[in-house]
Amino acid sequence: FMGKRDTYKYELTKGNKVVYVGITNNPYCREKEHHQDKDFDKMKIVGNISTLDGASKWESDRIKTYMNNHNGNTPLYNQNEHGK
């Protein structure tokens, strides 16, 4: 049993820069929460709705890819490569 697909993968962008990578089961509420403490233009849903496991793996991989392309720096609002 794979677990249910209820998790969205997303990026927050400011201009053409990715400032945060995350996952959520409620994009609408999550976007409102992010607006309280982050400066970004839009929330972009990435790919298809996933299982939590699949989304978590994507999140770590996506942040690592970002870091590889940005001298080891995480996106502005990600504290570490696990998206926390």
Spans of features found by a protein language model:
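Structure-specific nucleic-acid interaction/processing domains
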Residues: 3-84
